């Protein structure tokens, strides 16, 4: 009988607790699931906006220079402006378009600016410990190193894939004579520059 008494208390507590998390959790899914460009306050200076507009215009492929880019170009423009969003972040702020819409749907500069502001404010950067922990998975001998060839393969084929040139630039000068990379020193190097 003692186990039965806590169960009704838990059930009684759950309905009381459920409304509180539901109320506090409601805004979070809206934030993650739908990006509302109208809710973004633009904090850029006039000079910055002019610079962004100039970069945006370089990606405009419309025949009459309508200042529009395809959804597929949005991530490229953001990266050209110094941001580093993941493809998933770009898709989320675009409203999760279908693959075929990436080349057919367009957005103008006025629609792009709130996206840029949102991405620039919400940079999710990992910590030193996060990166070291992630690389430790590949440390088969538990000696603080990973094989350069394996890291090259992972960077070029998994997640946000990097080009071979990007991988080579990133790993340049990091391998020892055995082709191993001290990943703690590597992470410090990456995070310092």
UniProtKB/Swiss-Prot annotation:
Organism: Mus musculus
Domain EF-hand: 47-84, 126-161
Composition skew (Low complexity), residue ranges: 14-28
Residues bearing PTM N,N-dimethylproline: 2
Compositionally biased residues, Basic and acidic residues: 1-13
Reported tissue expression: Expressed in atrial muscle and in fetal skeletal and ventricular muscle.
UniProt KW keywords: Methylation, Motor protein, Muscle protein, Myosin, Repeat
Record's subunit section: Myosin is a hexamer of 2 heavy chains and 4 light chains.
Protein's name in the database: Myosin light chain 4
């Amino acid at each position: 009988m003692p186990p039965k008494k806590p169960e009704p208390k838990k059930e009684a507590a759950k309905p009381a607790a459920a409304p509180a998390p539901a109320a506090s959790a409601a805004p979070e899914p809206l934030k993650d699931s739908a990006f509302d460009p109208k809710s973004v306050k633009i904090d850029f200076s006039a000079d910055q906006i002019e610079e962004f507009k100039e970069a945006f215009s370089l990606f405009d492929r419309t025949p009459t220079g309508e200042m529009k880019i395809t959804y597929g170009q949005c991530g490229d423009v953001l990266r050209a402006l110094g941001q580093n969003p993941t493809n998933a972040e770009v898709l989320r702020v675009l409203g999760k378009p279908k693959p075929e819409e990436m080349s057919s749907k367009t957005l103008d500069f006025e629609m792009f600016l709130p996206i840029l502001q949102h991405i620039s404010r919400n940079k999710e950067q990992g910590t030193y410990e996060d990166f070291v922990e992630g690389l430790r998975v590949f440390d088969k001998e538990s000696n603080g190193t990973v094989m350069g060839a394996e890291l090259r393969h992972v960077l070029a084929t998994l997640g946000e894939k990097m080009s071979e040139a990007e991988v080579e630039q990133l790993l340049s000068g990091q391998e020892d004579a055995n082709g191993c990379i001290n990943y703690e020193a590597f992470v410090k190097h990456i995070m310092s520059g």
